[in-house]
Amino acid sequence: MKILNLYACLGGNRFLWHDEHEITAVEMDPELARLYSERFPNDTVIVGDAHQYLLDHYKEFDFIWS
């Protein structure tokens, strides 16, 4: 399942999902995004505006967490 994790911060809710999912996390703060990447190295992390990313990519995901 492809999951979009908006406003990811440090990934607290990320612990709800197993590693077999393909997860893309969006976080505005570069430092928080870096820390998220360290905690979840298999996820794709986007540094940017979550709302805009959602508008541009919502059709690419099976589940969206906001």
Where are these regions (language model features)?
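Conserved active-site and SAM-binding loop architecture
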Residues: 1-66
